[in-house]
């Protein structure tokens, strides 16, 4: 899965345009970001250098202004510098399975931020074991998070979106309601 990094100044400049469009055209006051608070990129053009630290500060300033404007903000994975300005953090790491030498884990981070921000782990219907993910969510105080689409998932075959193989709402309706 490849993707391109955009100049930090371009990203920040376009957030206002995006927020204004969804607010004015659709009446939506909430905004969700996948990369703000998750990915830091610098700009190493000698004419307009932006370090990763400056990029982080630009993201924090933008998040502050969105919160002050009354927007609800959702971020993905939520690195610590954006958590104070996020109303909800999705895809937070609530498991330590990435490290093979660990037998048990204590959710220190979740204990520290519990009550400060709402958060969830990865989408339950996209996890390897949905029952285990529900138990881990309860264990860490995380909310339950699902990813749904209305159309049949067969439409996603041979596309860049096959990771959403288990997102058809009709298949999950009885389980989630």
Model-derived features: where do they sit?
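Active-site-proximal substrate-binding groove within the catalytic cores of carbohydrate-active enzymes
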Residues: 2-29, 37-177
């Amino acid at each position: 899965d490849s993707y391109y990094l955009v100049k930090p100044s371009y990203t920040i400049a376009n957030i206002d345009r995006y927020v204004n469009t969804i607010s004015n055209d659709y009446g939506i006051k909430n905004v969700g970001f996948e990369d703000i608070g998750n990915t830091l990129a610098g700009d190493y053009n000698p004419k307009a250098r932006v370090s990763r630290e400056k990029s982080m500060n630009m993201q924090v300033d933008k998040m502050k202004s969105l919160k002050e404007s009354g927007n609800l903000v959702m971020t993905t994975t939520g690195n610590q510098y954006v958590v104070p300005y996020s109303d909800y953090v999705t895809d937070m790491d609530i498991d330590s399975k990435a490290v093979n030498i660990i037998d048990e884990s204590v959710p220190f981070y979740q204990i520290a931020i519990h009550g400060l921000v709402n958060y969830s782990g990865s989408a339950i219907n996209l996890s390897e074991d949905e029952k285990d993910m529900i138990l881990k969510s309860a264990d860490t105080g995380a909310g339950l998070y699902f990813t749904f689409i209305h159309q049949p998932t067969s439409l996603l075959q041979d596309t860049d979106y096959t990771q959403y193989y288990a997102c058809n709402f009709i298949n999950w309706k009885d389980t989630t309601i």
